[in-house]
Amino acid sequence: MDKNKEMTPTTPSLARLETFFKEKVTPNLVERFQYKNAMLVPKLKKISINIGVGAAAAEPKLLEIALQELAQITGQKPQIRKSKKAISNFKLREGQAIGCRVTLRRKAMYEFFDRFVSLAVPRIRDFRGLSDTSFDGRGNYTVGVREQIIFPEIDIDKVPRISGMDISFVTSASTDEEAYVLLSELGMPFKKKNN
């Protein structure tokens, strides 16, 4: 082996989906929406994953489990989310930890998106496609997952309680149509539209 080759820092490799976006999706979107150049093409900016553990007020151990599971799924340490105000009906005090969140960007974002679409979504029970009505009007898409066990990183035998999560895909698209086409091109399995 050449010693100089070993010492040079390697450039970070692109995620498989990021390469696919640059080579295939960008030209398709430029053609479809008639952008003047490729820099105007909407991009996936970040993915935010949120787990709300309302029962953590009574059982703090549930929050620790949610933190551990979210770290396994994303490969990143989650932030603890605290309540903003006290609600007596839910026995909730202001500042009490009630959930956790992770925000993924760049390579980690593309790798999570790839795993979500190709490994996790097909494991959803009775899956017929993701709803295309969960866009927010500004080009962002949120999907609710009912069971964390759809992710292959979670061992079903070690899960004490089934919990869900919200996954938000934030894009630079200005309209829902552009975001829908972007996510579809990246492989998001939306329900087929009846024509």
From Swiss-Prot:
GO MF annotation list: rRNA binding; structural constituent of ribosome; tRNA binding
SUPFAM superfamilies: RL5-like
GO cellular component, one term: ribonucleoprotein complex
Pfam family for this entry, one: Ribosomal_L5
Record InterPro entries: Ribosomal_uL5, Ribosomal_uL5_bac-type, Ribosomal_uL5_C, Ribosomal_uL5_dom_sf, Ribosomal_uL5_N
Keywords in alphabetical order: Ribonucleoprotein, Ribosomal protein, RNA-binding, rRNA-binding, tRNA-binding
One GO term of the biological process aspect: translation
This protein's record includes keyword Kinase: no
Stated role: This is one of the proteins that bind and probably mediate the attachment of the 5S RNA into the large ribosomal subunit, where it forms part of the central protuberance. In the 70S ribosome it contacts protein S13 of the 30S subunit (bridge B1b), connecting the 2 subunits; this bridge is implicated in subunit movement. Contacts the P site tRNA; the 5S rRNA and some of its associated proteins might help stabilize positioning of ribosome-bound tRNAs.
Annotated family: Belongs to the universal ribosomal protein uL5 family.
Subunit structure: Part of the 50S ribosomal subunit; part of the 5S rRNA/L5/L18/L25 subcomplex. Contacts the 5S rRNA and the P site tRNA. Forms a bridge to the 30S subunit in the 70S ribosome.
Record HAMAP family: Ribosomal_uL5_B
NCBIfam families referenced in this protein's UniProt entry, alphabetically: PRK00010.1 (NF000585)
Protein name as annotated: Large ribosomal subunit protein uL5
Protein species of origin: Pelodictyon phaeoclathratiforme (strain DSM 5477 / BU-1)
